[in-house]
From Swiss-Prot:
Residue intervals passing through the bilayer: 14-34, 67-87
Subunit architecture: Homopentamer.
Database matches in InterPro entries: Mechanosensitive_channel_CS, MS_channel, MSC/AndL, MscL_channel
Membrane topology: Multi-pass membrane protein
Gene Ontology cellular-component annotations: plasma membrane
GO MF, one example: mechanosensitive monoatomic ion channel activity
Intracellular or extracellular location(s): Cell membrane
Gene: mscL
Listed name of the protein: Large-conductance mechanosensitive channel
Role played: Channel that opens in response to stretch forces in the membrane lipid bilayer. May participate in the regulation of osmotic pressure changes within the cell.
NCBIfam families reported in the protein's UniProt record: mscL, PRK00567.1-4, PRK13955.1
Family: Belongs to the MscL family.
Keywords: Cell membrane, Ion channel, Ion transport, Membrane, Transmembrane, Transmembrane helix, Transport
Length: 133
C-alpha cells in the first residue's frame, strides 16, 4: 500500500498539479490586489463609487444583504476581465516566440529536395503547355 501511495504521490502529473495549485493561489493574490487596489478605485472615480455592499432589503428585523452578492459578482467580472487580458497578452507573446522558433527550425533543403522541386516544376510546365495545345 505504501508503494502504491508513493507511486501516486510522486507521479509527474500529481506534482505538476500541486505546483500549478500553489502558483495559481499566488497569482490569484496578485490579481485580487490588482482589482482591489487599482482597477476598482479607478472605476470608482469614473463611475462615482462602486460599492454595492450596503444595499439591502429589510423586512422587520431581518435583512437580505443582496448588495454584498452584487459586489461579489462585480468583483468576479473585473477579475475575469483582468485575467482574460493577461492571458490574451501572454498568448500573443508566446505565439510570436513559437513562430520565430519554427522559422529557425526549418532546415535548408537537401540537394535531392532541390532537384525533386525542379523536376516537379518542369512537370507542371509540361502539363500546362499540353493543356494549352
Amino acid at each position: 500500500m505504501w508503494n502504491e501511495f508513493k507511486k501516486f504521490a510522486f507521479k509527474g502529473n500529481v506534482i505538476d498539479l500541486a505546483v500549478g495549485v500553489v502558483i495559481g493561489a499566488a497569482f490569484g493574490k496578485i490579481v485580487s490586489s490588482l482589482v482591489k487596489d487599482i482597477i476598482t478605485p479607478l472605476l470608482g472615480m469614473v463611475l462615482g463609487g462602486v460599492n454595492f455592499t450596503d444595499l439591502k432589503l429589510t423586512f422587520g428585523k431581518s435583512s437580505i444583504m443582496y448588495g454584498n452578492f452584487i459586489q461579489t459578482i462585480f468583483d468576479f467580472l473585473i477579475i475575469a476581465a483582468a485575467i482574460f487580458m493577461f492571458v490574451k497578452v501572454f498568448n500573443k507573446l508566446t505565439s510570436k516566440r513559437e513562430e520565430e522558433e519554427k522559422k529557425e527550425e526549418l532546415p535548408e533543403p537537401t540537394k535531392e529536395e532541390e532537384i525533386l522541386g525542379e523536376i516537379r516544376d518542369l512537370l507542371k510546365q509540361q502539363n500546362s503547355s499540353k493543356d494549352r495545345a
